[in-house]
A protein has these predicted regions:
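Structural scaffold elements adjacent to functional motifs in cytosolic proteins
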Residues: 1-126, 143-144
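Intrinsically disordered, low-complexity acidic/polar and Pro/Ser/Thr-rich regulatory regions
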Residues: 2-11, 139-216
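Terminal low-complexity, poorly structured segments
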Residues: 23, 131, 198-202
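Short amphipathic alpha-helices and their capping/turn residues within compact interaction modules
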Residues: 27, 31-32, 136-139, 155
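Beta-strand cores of modular interaction/reader domains in eukaryotic scaffold and signaling proteins
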Residues: 73-76, 119-121, 130-135, 149-154
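A short secondary-structure junction signal
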Residues: 85-88, 128-133, 142, 160-166
Length: 216
């Protein structure tokens, strides 16, 4: 792609990793801090545990070429419940992330990770937000309070209008006017004219010259 910088590639092409790529390429590099050649600009390193999708959607814009589906990518910690390393905390605001299924990811006949498909629900009903949560088998992915995961949050195929409006909430943040500051080069106002002296000094009229003539 002549004339196109590597870091600009993901601004023109949709970030859509396969399951194998998610756990064998992206997640290991996110854990080690290696560069992702531009894709890291689209992956937000933020703790999303306890956050509702609408709040995340208002804060982070969807990835380029994925505005209609609302794709947002996160590198985060899936926190474990207190006293358990198996069950994960799924409550988020007034709703809950419900695990729909867990699938093993294999490459060349060997398990390399797994993906959990989740749906965000309120009062038992789907809101139209879904997420794929990818986990690898690297030991460094396990931390003291949970497991480091790579997530893709997006709209379901038949998401209701309410969810689609939530996905576009980031536009309101972008449209906020910038604070207006006075120009440092603004012309200074001239100082006010000095007030007239109410008691000006008296000017005496010129004195007449007296010439004496002496007669002899």
């Amino acid at each position: 792609m002549e004339g196109l910088d590597v870091d600009d590639v993901f601004h023109h092409y949709r970030l859509c990793p396969t399951e194998v790529e998610a756990v064998t390429y992206y997640l290991p590099r996110l854990l080690s801090g290696e560069t992702l050649h531009g894709a890291d600009k689209l992956i937000h390193r933020v703790e999303i545990s306890g956050c509702e999708p609408k709040d995340l959607a208002a804060r982070y814009a969807p990835a380029p070429q994925a505005v209609s589906s609302g794709d947002r990518f996160f590198f985060t910690t899936c926190k474990s419940k207190r006293g358990s390393n198996l069950q994960s905390v799924r409550g988020a605001g007034a709703g809950t992330w419900s695990i729909q299924k867990t699938t093993e990811i294999c490459h060349a006949g060997v398990k390399v990770g797994e993906v959990k498909n989740l749906s965000f629900k309120k009062k038992g009903k789907s809101t139209g937000w879904v997420m794929e949560e990818y986990r690898c088998l690297l030991p460094e992915a396990t931390v003291s309070d949970g497991v480091k995961v790579f997530c893709k949050m997006h709209l379901a195929q038949h998401a209701p209008d309410a969810a689609r409006q939530e996905s576009e909430a980031y536009k309101l943040q972008q449209q906020q006017p910038e604070a207006v500051t006075p120009s440092t080069h603004a012309q200074k106002r001239p100082p006010p004219a000095a007030a007239a002296d109410p008691h000006p000094p008296l000017t005496l009229p010129p004195q007449p010259t007296i010439t004496r003539t002496i007669c002899w």
